[in-house]
Amino acid sequence: MSFSPLIRQLIDALRTLPGVGQKTAQRMALQLLERDRSGGTRLAQALSQAMTGVGHCRQCRTLTEEELCPQCADPRRDDTLLCVVEGPMDVYAVEQTGYRGRYFVLKGHLSPLDGLGPEAIGIPQLVARIEEQGTFTEVILATNPTVEGEATAHYIAQLLTNKGLITSRIAHGVPLGGELELVDGGTLAHSFAGRKPIAL
């Protein structure tokens, strides 16, 4: 089926969303045009406002429309803890755990094949933030448990070796409530390597 230029433009725009392929984009576009034009208009307005009004927090680099995000603006947070994550969605995930320290958001992970070195993801800014703040005693490396995430965490830990900080890595392994037979070998190996004694 061939679509008019405006419909094709809408479909192509919707395909830029993660996980949205050709068929899904077509369904979304036709749904908005045929059944929910007011919803489509609200979506367009919200998207336009977000694209022009949302930037990055000057301290942690997460997404916000203010100079400081809510976490950086909160004086009750623990200034001795700094959690390093790969992206803004990770901040929201860590917040669900009750973590009350500060954040630094990288722009992804090290990936030399994709041209993403330390400068591209903001590691020099991370080091500068640690040195300028001067209150951190522990840096928690909460990068994803992928090869690239592990390499990024290792690189940062090496950089911070002589800074007088505790550098820790979030644990990962068998999920709570998971069954061993369903866990992949790499995850299980990590779980065995990171095993801890049972405190009685």
UniProtKB/Swiss-Prot annotation:
Q: Which PROSITE patterns match?
A: RECR, TOPRIM
What InterPro entries does UniProt report for this protein, alphabetically? Answer: DNA_Rcmb_RecR, Rcmb_RecR, Rcmb_RecR_Znf, TOPRIM_dom, TOPRIM_RecR
Please provide the Gene Ontology terms (biological process) for this protein.
Answer: DNA recombination; DNA repair
Q: Which Pfam families match?
A: RecR_C, RecR_HhH, RecR_ZnF, Toprim_4
Which SMART domains does the record cross-reference, listed alphabetically?
A: TOPRIM
Keyword field contains DNA repair: yes
Q: Which GO molecular-function terms appear in the entry?
A: DNA binding; zinc ion binding
- What are the residue ranges of zinc fingers typed C4-type? 57-72
Alphabetically ordered keywords of this record:
DNA damage, DNA recombination, DNA repair, Metal-binding, Zinc, Zinc-finger
User: Which stretches make up the Toprim domain?
Assistant: 80-175
Q: Which PANTHER family match?
A: RECOMBINATION PROTEIN RECR
Q: What's its job?
A: May play a role in DNA repair. It seems to be involved in an RecBC-independent recombinational process of DNA repair. It may act with RecF and RecO.
- NCBIfam families in UniProt: recR
Family as reported in the entry's similarity comment: Belongs to the RecR family.
Q: What is this protein called?
A: Recombination protein RecR
Species in which this protein is naturally found = Pseudomonas fluorescens (strain SBW25)
